[in-house]
UniProtKB/Swiss-Prot annotation:
Top EC category: hydrolase
Record comment regarding domains: Composed of three domains: the N-terminal N domain, which is responsible for interactions with the ribosome, the central G domain, which binds GTP, and the C-terminal M domain, which binds the RNA and the signal sequence of the RNC.
GO process annotations (BP): SRP-dependent cotranslational protein targeting to membrane
Positions of GTP binding: 103-110, 185-189, 245-248
Protein name from the UniProt record: Signal recognition particle 54 kDa protein
One GO CC term on file: signal recognition particle
Catalytic reaction annotation: GTP + H2O = GDP + phosphate + H(+)
EC number(s) recorded for this UniProt protein: 3.6.5.4
Length: 447
């Protein structure tokens, strides 16, 4: 079960087991939990092989403890397993926007149609539902009930057995009524193993409707079997996306998610419960955060985010040294905020030039001095206008007074910040392209 991974993370971070042994134990628990959740065995062992490879090849940044660094790698690789940085676009690209839902029997397609309608209605769109599932007698009544529940009109013809005809007439009716989004619930008469028939029928309705989006609804309980269905669907309908339902009611949700992600298909939503509002946009990183225990890894992710932001500023400084552009006070602000995310002041102050705390182990008094200086500088930066941050040369005495008054500081504090900034730009120009210059400038590498 994936919840076991959360317990393993907590045990790993707080336990006293020697590091190497703790890593081996965690990887075994990770493999066991993923396989129990019906994640494909090859995917599981490929995942853990990548984790081990990174452990051997990469060095932990100084802002992270070894255990924190290991968990950040696990987080990164698990996120890739479930789809990575791919962010689904749920916004309609034009109006009216026609969505066609397809799925096998029992996938939760009709319920999902209602949830999807409610999702878009809450976003301010006028939504219409078309009941074109003519093979399940209760489908029309169920969709009508859902529509009444959320205040969305439903088009259907209970006595008509021609799904394509109903779908076309329903779409035409809602287009005339100026609906923004039209969701068509198509037939779900085929079971798992009958993918060919399902896709043939999907193509027929697609040709008739020419929808803007085709969404395949998959029940999470089929686990890794979702791969074949999702793969064939993705090949047949490149514009399509996928909704995985019933994530709350099965231990195989991870298997289904990883299987679909492996096909390259986009997972747009996941169903997380029976209620009408329990449909959420799928985000792999957010999902992995839940698996690992957000409370346990939040500080680690914050440090990693700070490191990434800091590296962007480092790159900007390299460009400045090569004569490309100029360091602005906005960059300084971003740098300080990034460093503050990375952890205790004792670990990051040495990387900020000009604070007089460039010692390997600064004293408590030096730390207090550095923290106070950072606090004053941030207050001053927060009181500056956009133009002042982008072009500090316009800050004259009257602007200094205004900034000082707005931040509760002395004019001398603002002058000190500007002097440091000017010296910083001069130093960057002097250093030029000498290798290792930024590391020397910042008192040692962070990453």
């Amino acid at each position: 079960m994936l919840e076991n991974i959360r317990d393993a993370v907590r045990k790993f971070l707080t336990g006293s087991t020697p590091y190497e042994k703790a890593v081996d134990e965690f990887i075994k628990e990770l493999q066991k939990s993923l396989i129990s959740s019906d994640v494909n065995v090859k995917l599981v062992f490929s995942l853990t092989a990548k984790i081990k490879e990174r452990l051997n090849k990469e060095k932990p940044p100084s802002v992270l403890e070894r255990k924190e660094w290991f968990i950040s790698i696990v987080y990164d690789e698990l996120s890739k397993l479930f789809g990575g940085d791919k962010e689904p676009n749920v916004n309609p690209t034009r109006l009216p926007f026609i969505i066609m839902l397809v799925g096998v029997q029992g996938s939760g397609k009709t319920t999902t149609a209602g949830k999807l309608a409610y999702f878009y209605k809450r976003r301010g769109y006028k939504v219409g539902l078309v009941a074109a599932d003519v093979y399940r007698p209760a489908a029309y009544d169920q969709l009508l009930q859902l529509g009444n529940q959320i205040g969305v009109p439903v088009y259907g013809e209970p006595n008509n057995q021609n799904a394509i005809e109903i779908a076309k007439k329903g779409v035409d009716t809602f287009v005339k009524n100026k609906m923004d989004i039209i969701i068509v619930d198509t037939a779900g008469r085929h079971g798992y193993g009958e993918e060919t028939k399902l896709l043939e029928e999907m193509k027929e309705i697609y040709e008739a409707l020419k929808p803007d989006d085709v969404i395949l609804v998959i029940d999470a309980s089929i686990g890794q079997k979702a791969y074949d269905l999702a793969s064939r669907f993705h090949q047949a309908s490149p514009i399509g996306s996928i909704i995985i339902t019933k994530m709350d009611g099965t231990a195989k949700g991870g298997g289904a998610l990883s299987a679909v992600a492996a096909t390259g298909a986009t997972i747009k939503f996941i169903g997380t419960g029976e209620k009408i509002d329990e449909l959420e946009i799928f985000n792999a990183k957010r999902y992995v955060s839940r698996i690992l225990g957000m409370g346990d890894i939040e500080s680690i992710l914050e440090k990693v985010k700070g490191l990434e932001e800091y590296e962007k500023i480092q790159k900007k400084m390299e460009d400045v040294m090569e004569g490309k552009g100029k360091l602005t006070l906005r960059d300084v602000y971003a740098q300080i905020m990034a460093l503050r995310k990375m952890g205790p002041l004792s670990k990051v102050l040495q990387h900020i030039p000009g604070l007089g705390v460039m010692l390997p182990t600064p004293s408590e008094d030096q730390l207090k001095l550095g923290e106070e200086k950072i606090r004053r500088w941030l207050a001053a930066l927060n009181s500056m206008t956009y133009k002042e941050l982008e072009n500090p040369s316009i800050i004259d005495k009257s602007r200094m007074r205004r900034i000082a008054e707005g931040s509760g500081l002395e004019v001398e504090d603002v002058r000190e910040l500007l002097e440091w900034y000017n010296n910083m730009n001069k130093l960057l120009k002097m250093v030029k392209r000498r290798r290792g210059s930024i590391d020397k400038l910042f008192g040692g590498k962070i990453g």
